[in-house]
């Protein structure tokens, strides 16, 4: 039975990934600090559901606790490490920057140090589409230069990519970084747009729409996203072999078993169309408050998913209208009973 160590299992994406892997017979050990960035009861409920599943165990501790991180990983001896835990959110990084240094830099360093000792077959870590900054070269391909982050959050994730490459090179640790694009779905975070919009519309409150609605996002349904991660677990990078046929667009490092992979839906959706889908699912119109662009935000994101497809055969299954309707059903069941 393969063993996977996942950080952030009480979080949105980590919860869904753990569920998927457990359903396939993996043993999963979760590691989560249960921080109060948002409603802790939502995190606790996710973990309670996982704890009822055979094969799951968990440790509650902070990423910054180096000793606890290394001790837990050494004891579990995972075949694979998936590092998803982080201080998330572009906008919150403007208010509380130190949290991003502690969790995203120090915490990620602790994971990499523990991985260096534990020697898993594959280390996979979350980056973000925010590293592409204000680039207008769309769709965003992994080979694009990402040297101009617009927020500290994006900067810490860019730093994580550089740190991971150095460890992959120095210690021959097969490493994949994934850049996520606007993830949504059931059990989502309260600070994400879909959650906030549905909550406000049901309460009769106005929703803030930035850049006067001229926003586009590559909305990625969470089940599609964790399925992509599952496929990538079995696609560990190896050192370049001149005898192997190169994959077009591959950014595999020439000096390390390391690559970066976008995980997105592969299409950009106008925010106003997304809001229309929410209204349709709710059967209720939104009160729309159009606003200027917010500091640190970008008008559009759009993932080039050709590399992900070439490596794994992945294709998204969820149309955003279906995904929104599914979220609304969950929201009403969980929050509005």
Task: For each feature predicted by the language model, list its residue ranges.
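N-terminal Rossmann-like NAD(P)+-binding domain of SDR-like oxidoreductases, especially those catalyzing
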Residues: 1-183, 232, 318, 330, ...
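Alpha-helical hydrophobic/aromatic positions enriched in membrane-embedded helices and signal peptides
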Residues: 3, 24, 31, 88, ...
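C-terminal substrate-binding subdomain of Rossmann-fold SDR/epimerase-dehydratase oxidoreductases
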Residues: 20, 61, 201-337
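Short, conserved catalytic or interaction motifs in soluble domains
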Residues: 39, 186, 265
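Conserved sequence/active-site signature of Rossmann-fold short-chain dehydrogenase/reductase
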Residues: 131-132, 183-185, 215, 225
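Hydrophobic alpha-helix immediately C-terminal to the catalytic Tyr-X-X-X-Lys motif of short-chain
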Residues: 159, 163, 167, 197, ...
């Amino acid at each position: 039975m393969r063993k996977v160590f996942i950080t952030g299992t009480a979080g949105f994406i980590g919860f869904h990934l753990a569920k998927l892997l457990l359903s396939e017979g993996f043993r999963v050990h979760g590691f989560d600090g249960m921080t109060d960035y948002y409603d802790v009861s939502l995190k606790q409920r996710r973990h309670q559901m996982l704890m009822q599943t055979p094969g799951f165990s968990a440790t509650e501790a902070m990423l910054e606790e180096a000793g606890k991180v290394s001790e837990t990983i050494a004891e579990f001896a995972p075949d694979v490490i998936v590092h998803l835990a982080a201080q998330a959110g572009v906008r919150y990084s403007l208010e509380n920057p130190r949290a991003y240094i502690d969790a995203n830099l120090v915490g990620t360093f602790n994971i990499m140090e523990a991985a260096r000792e534990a020697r898993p077959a594959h280390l996979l870590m979350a980056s973000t589409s925010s590293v592409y900054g204000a680039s207008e070269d769309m769709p965003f391909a992994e080979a694009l230069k990402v040297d101009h982050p617009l927020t500290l959050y994006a900067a810490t994730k860019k730093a994580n990519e550089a740190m991971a490459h150095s460890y992959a090179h120095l210690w021959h640790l097969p490493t994949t970084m994934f850049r996520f694009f606007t993830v949504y779905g059931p059990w989502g975070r309260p600070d994400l747009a879909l959650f906030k919009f549905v909550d406000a519309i049901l309460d009769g409150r106005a929703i803030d729409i930035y850049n006067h609605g001229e926003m586009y996002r590559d909305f990625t349904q969470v089940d599609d996203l964790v399925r992509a991660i599952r496929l990538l677990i079995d696609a560990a990078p190896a050192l370049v072999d001149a005898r192997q046929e190169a994959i077009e667009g591959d950014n595999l490092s020439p000096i390390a078993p390391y690559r970066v992979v976008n995980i997105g839906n592969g299409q950009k959706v106008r925010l106003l169309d997304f809001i229309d889908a929410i209204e349709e699912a709710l059967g209720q119109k939104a009160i729309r408050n159009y606003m200027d662009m917010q500091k640190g935000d970008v008008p559009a994101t759009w993932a080039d998913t050709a590399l992900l497809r070439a490596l794994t055969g992945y294709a998204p299954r969820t149309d955003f209208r279906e995904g929104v309707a599914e979220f609304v059903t969950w929201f009403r069941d969980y929050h509005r009973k």
